[in-house]
Curated annotation (Swiss-Prot):
One of its GO terms (biological process) is killing of cells of another organism. Keywords: Amidation, Antibiotic, Antimicrobial, Cleavage on pair of basic residues, Cytolysis, Membrane, Secreted, Signal, Target cell membrane, Target membrane. This is Amphipathic peptide CT2. Belongs to the non-disulfide-bridged peptide (NDBP) superfamily. Short antimicrobial peptide (group 4) family. Residues 1-23 form the signal peptide.
Amino acid sequence: MKTQIVILIVAVLFLQLVSQSDAFLKGIIDTVSKLFGKRGLKNLDQYNDLFDGEISDADIKYLQDLMR
């Protein structure tokens, strides 16, 4: 009976370790793929969308004040 409990505890700990490391590794892989992907190589400026013809200078100033 004691052996079964020990095996159960070890199995639960191992499954938790695998699930947590899977999420950690997925985060690292996603970050690396974003850095070296097609979109990651572009110069992504946060104000690129502000240079639309429909947005006035006052709107741009207001949005820049919000971003500060």
